Amino acid sequence: MTAATDIDRAAPKRLSVRPTIDPSATVRDCRLGAWTEVGARTLLIETAMDDYSYVVNDSDIIYADIGKFVNIASHVRVNPGQHPMDRASQHHFQYRSAAYGMGADDAGFFDWRRSFPVTIGPDVWIGHGAIVKGGVSIATGAVIGSGAMVTKDVAPYTIVVGVPAAPLRARFDRPIQDAMMRIAWWDWSHDRIKERMADFRALSAEAFCQKYDPKA
């Protein structure tokens, strides 16, 4: 048996301004920003993902607009397909008809699905196994707990958990939330963020706001 200390550590991951997409991922009709990453066996369809955002392995994201610095854990579902519960049948033979030799697919049904996009603001964290239903907006700085099912909009800097997801608490009190929105650090340049890395690491949110809030 080999001691753990004798095993070479993998080289540090290095991203770039070009999106990093795992070979096993499927990305179709998407726009990906700089320093973005798509993990193994993840599916992205008709989705925009802005700079620095990433999604880990085994996630499905469809019809979504994802802001900067969004953190999406594994096994997350964003905008899972809805079935026509109001029809005589819920089965997809009605809209994937070609697969069953029953004529052309129902393009209108897929347009209906597209009419409920998901919007995710900057600096959001979506935990392992969470589900975000169509038409939902998740605002800046929010946290979606692992295994949560989000069926309603989530306010800025709010932590939600459970099925259906409900607010647990705020990440910060309102003055800090407002200051963070004024600072909008997620819109800083790459060089500015790099220059201020020590403050991101060492300062509390309150101290960070005191230093960088233009109204402070």
Where are these regions (language model features)?
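Conserved switch/coupling elements of ABC/ABC-like ATPase nucleotide-binding domains
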Residues: 164-168
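Conserved catalytic-core motifs of eukaryotic protein kinase domains, centered on the activation segment
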Residues: 82-84, 154, 170-172
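ABC ATPase nucleotide-binding domains
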Residues: 192-214
